[in-house]
Amino acid sequence: FVNQHLCGSHLVEALYLVCGERGFFYTPKAXXEAEDPQVGEVELGGGPGLGGLQPLALAGPQQXXGIVEQCCTGICSLYQLENYCN
């Protein structure tokens, strides 16, 4: 894994890879985005207690920018992605 731009589904796939069963969270940029079911929830794969849609946490790590600004607009590393794991 090298530092790279990760946007959209590529960012989600990278978070699944890095976080695994721990899951992950992010801070939506606007409240309207958090109300969108496709933005505010993520479908978790099988496993005890993880089935179905689970709401994402609305609080992220204490950083100047959110994950999209950090990893899509900018370039992020594996270690930066780990900051968003539960």
Curated annotation (Swiss-Prot):
<dbReference type="GO" id="GO:0005615">
    <property type="term" value="C:extracellular space"/>
</dbReference>
<dbReference type="GO" id="GO:0050714">
    <property type="term" value="P:positive regulation of protein secretion"/>
</dbReference>
<keyword id="KW-0372">Hormone</keyword>
<feature type="disulfide bond" description="Interchain (between B and A chains)">
    <location>
        <begin position="7"/>
        <end position="72"/>
    </location>
</feature>
<comment type="subunit">
    <text>Heterodimer of a B chain and an A chain linked by two disulfide bonds.</text>
</comment>
<dbReference type="InterPro" id="IPR016179">
    <property type="entry name" value="Insulin-like"/>
</dbReference>
<comment type="similarity">
    <text>Belongs to the insulin family.</text>
</comment>
<dbReference type="GO" id="GO:0005179">
    <property type="term" value="F:hormone activity"/>
</dbReference>
<protein>
    <recommendedName>
        <fullName>Insulin</fullName>
    </recommendedName>
</protein>
<comment type="function">
    <text>Insulin decreases blood glucose concentration. It increases cell permeability to monosaccharides, amino acids and fatty acids. It accelerates glycolysis, the pentose phosphate cycle, and glycogen synthesis in liver.</text>
</comment>
<dbReference type="InterPro" id="IPR004825">
    <property type="entry name" value="Insulin"/>
</dbReference>
<dbReference type="InterPro" id="IPR036438">
    <property type="entry name" value="Insulin-like_sf"/>
</dbReference>
<feature type="disulfide bond">
    <location>
        <begin position="71"/>
        <end position="76"/>
    </location>
</feature>
<dbReference type="InterPro" id="IPR022352">
    <property type="entry name" value="Insulin_family"/>
</dbReference>
<dbReference type="GO" id="GO:0006006">
    <property type="term" value="P:glucose metabolic process"/>
</dbReference>
<feature type="propeptide" description="C peptide">
    <location>
        <begin position="33"/>
        <end position="63"/>
    </location>
</feature>
<dbReference type="GO" id="GO:0042593">
    <property type="term" value="P:glucose homeostasis"/>
</dbReference>
<keyword id="KW-0313">Glucose metabolism</keyword>
<feature type="disulfide bond" description="Interchain (between B and A chains)">
    <location>
        <begin position="19"/>
        <end position="85"/>
    </location>
</feature>
<keyword id="KW-0964">Secreted</keyword>
<dbReference type="InterPro" id="IPR022353">
    <property type="entry name" value="Insulin_CS"/>
</dbReference>
<keyword id="KW-1015">Disulfide bond</keyword>
<dbReference type="GO" id="GO:1901701">
    <property type="term" value="P:cellular response to oxygen-containing compound"/>
</dbReference>
<keyword id="KW-0119">Carbohydrate metabolism</keyword>
<dbReference type="Pfam" id="PF00049">
    <property type="entry name" value="Insulin"/>
</dbReference>
